[in-house]
């Protein structure tokens, strides 16, 4: 396992965790991921792995390993928000996610509205809500209007499919509708706590 951070090393490490059958391997992988958390590019790379539903098209790793690596990446991302979204000191080193990186992350997170894996989508909805608690409306004023637009457009597409009796072909708008509603529900839940 490569100990220097890079996006490919992160993918390999997450895949190793996804196929690990023993506690020692999981502990080693977890320790490596903990070290990388302080790297500035780690959070965007982690999110890229988590939301890359088509990244294993050449079958480099078994499908179930790839899916589990994506899920693990999203869970680690979600769990790191409360710890690293705001600047902090870790082992006497300032850990900061730049404003530009945060903006890219917020934009990329909304790709979850089209996420085919339910487990990734659920964890991403919680991650969005945690970030929204800190950044909405100041840094992320477009969050609620974007979710509202997604809900309206997806509902209209589902309705049109139902009227034309092609509801079986409306899986993508239905998925978007469900995910947008789930993200909004998680945000409201986070705002009221």
What are these regions (language model features)?
Residues 2-151, 176-193:
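Alpha-helical solenoid scaffolds in large eukaryotic transport, assembly, and signaling factors
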């Amino acid at each position: 396992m490569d100990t220097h951070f890079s996006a490919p090393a992160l993918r390999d490490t997450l895949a190793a965790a996804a196929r690990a059958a023993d506690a020692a391997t999981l502990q080693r992988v977890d320790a490596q991921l903990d070290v990388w958390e302080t790297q500035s590019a780690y959070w965007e790379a982690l999110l890229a792995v988590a939301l890359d539903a088509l990244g294993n098209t050449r079958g480099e790793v078994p499908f179930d390993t790839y899916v589990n690596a994506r899920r693990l990446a999203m869970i680690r991302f979600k769990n790191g928000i409360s710890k690293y979204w705001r600047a902090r000191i870790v082992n006497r080193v300032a850990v900061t996610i730049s404003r530009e990186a945060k903006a890219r992350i917020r934009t990329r997170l909304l790709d979850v509205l089209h996420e085919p894996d339910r487990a990734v989508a659920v964890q991403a909805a919680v991650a969005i809500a945690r970030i929204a608690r800190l950044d909405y409306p100041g840094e992320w004023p477009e969050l609620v209007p974007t979710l509202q637009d997604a809900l309206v457009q997806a509902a209209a597409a589902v309705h049109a499919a139902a009227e034309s009796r092609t509801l079986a072909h409306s899986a993508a708008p239905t998925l978007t509708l469900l995910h947008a509603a789930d993200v909004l529900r998680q945000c409201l839940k986070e705002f009221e706590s």
